[in-house]
């Protein structure tokens, strides 16, 4: 019996059951991934005990020599990974990374161009329920109805009309390659700063499988999980000229002490991402996504924009009797985890939606490849044809579990 099981069996049980879910179910949420044992060991270390307000060499607490080493490793590896002039690894999340950039560049009421959440953007790109939409004047851009890809002509027209101080680029549900150079050209035309939120595609960028935003943007933010496969957290890359202002907007601007155990885990993840194996892994993510997209379409599903260039796809259910909510719940019963998601020009509420978002990073970490993607598409089709048949969904879950047992990940934790 472990120390935790002995002291708090309720929490220990919840952790064990969640470990079983991650081990035996099929995880297809595009924003989730599974970290290595090395990353978890760093995050579960004694560094969780250390306060370290400030930055390496300039702390407000004593005893920071060891955490300075760790943070400098994370910074140097991040800069090497993305070819950036400056990196701040302290943001607790992607949202806080974005907030720090907003506060570095903007004053309340300034105009910002950001991708419409309903078209694949993110809450922090100007949603009225988020700080970004409350503090700043947001002008949303989106995708075309015909291609369901970013309407660069509309972006330029809106930029010329509204003269934004900043253009926010990036998405949380966009399956196509983003043309960062086009955004840079538009921004230069109106004198705007460019902030790219590459949270979803950071791993692909690191591996050279998606164009890098770093040469085209003053600021690049990201989460450190998702395709980057690190701990849950955030990071900001920027040009050296903005480093001092940016750092002060993280601390003391919007955060106090950094989470040094998480920064240690980030450092480990960045080392992993610098390896040749990581590039192979990212290529497999993309290969799996393309294979799954083709297999889903062969099973009769419609995908927004007709496919994918990256790690995710949006299944458009608007022409079926299903909603995203119903599909998510049925797939969950079948041992397949996805999330309901709005599609461009969706007429349903965000709580119901007309689509589901599917991603391949976590399944690829398990070791699944193209042959399994055909099976996965079959499982999804079978489940969504039987949303009201709990017995059938349970039978599909059994097949999913059987497949996943061939690809162990955390089995030592269940011994």
UniProtKB/Swiss-Prot annotation:
Keywords assigned by UniProt, alphabetized: Amino-acid biosynthesis, Cytoplasm, One-carbon metabolism, Pyridoxal phosphate, Transferase
A GO molecular-function annotation: pyridoxal phosphate binding
This protein's pathway: One-carbon metabolism; tetrahydrofolate interconversion; Amino-acid biosynthesis; glycine biosynthesis; glycine from L-serine: step 1/1
Source organism, top-level taxon: Bacteria
Record-listed (6S)-5,6,7,8-tetrahydrofolate binding positions: 117, 121-123, 241, 349-351
Site feature location: Plays an important role in substrate specificity: 225
Modification N6-(pyridoxal phosphate)lysine, positions: 226
UniProt key word Cytoplasm: yes
Record's subcellular location: Cytoplasm
Function: Catalyzes the reversible interconversion of serine and glycine with tetrahydrofolate (THF) serving as the one-carbon carrier. This reaction serves as the major source of one-carbon groups required for the biosynthesis of purines, thymidylate, methionine, and other important biomolecules. Also exhibits THF-independent aldolase activity toward beta-hydroxyamino acids, producing glycine and aldehydes, via a retro-aldol mechanism.
Gene designation per UniProt: glyA
Enzyme Commission number(s) of this protein: 2.1.2.1
GO cellular component entries: cytosol
Keyword Amino-acid biosynthesis: yes
NCBIfam families, per the entry: PRK00011.1
Protein name: Serine hydroxymethyltransferase
Main location: cytoplasm
Pfam families: SHMT
Family assignment from sequence similarity: Belongs to the SHMT family.
Cofactor: pyridoxal 5'-phosphate
UniProt catalytic activity: (6R)-5,10-methylene-5,6,7,8-tetrahydrofolate + glycine + H2O = (6S)-5,6,7,8-tetrahydrofolate + L-serine
One GO-annotated biological process of the protein: glycine biosynthetic process from serine
SUBUNIT field: Homodimer.
